[in-house]
Amino acid sequence: EVTAAATDVKAGSLRHDPFAMLPFCGYNMADYWGHWIEMQKKVGDKFPKVYQVNWFRKDEDGNFMWPGYGDNARVLDWIVRRAAGEVEAIDGVTGRYPKFEDFNLDGLDIDEAVWAKLFAIDPDAWAAEMDDTEEYFSQFGDKLPAAITEQLAKFRERIAAAKA
């Protein structure tokens, strides 16, 4: 769905709008990112954790794989326990994933096979996403923080390993 802040974008397409701040940010986004990278160095392990979810992943029949609504609280439960150091995570291509046994799936029709599909990735799609992201970042030139370039390179390595 396209929101008022994103009226120049077609529904279903990705808009490069970091933190949904483009209409409101009064300075170069590369400087903005650099600020947050420096803040993380100063604050260390007290810096807020960032998690990404895709509530709308569909199976091969076009059905949503995650039930959504109130069951989204299960994801928040895992995030809180992860941030508190109560559960571990598995390193994956796009980040760190919950372990099946650490996630509250009581009452849901999600077995280990469905769980694996929830976290499966398409390396070719992610490689194309990296191409698009790097093209977007190219507009920032030398202002783009090196930490971002380094993370993109590491991400490309993980994608290549997933393809192998």
Give the label of every model feature segment.
Residues 1-164:
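Conserved NTP phosphate-binding and transfer environment spanning the P-loop NTPase/kinase superfamily
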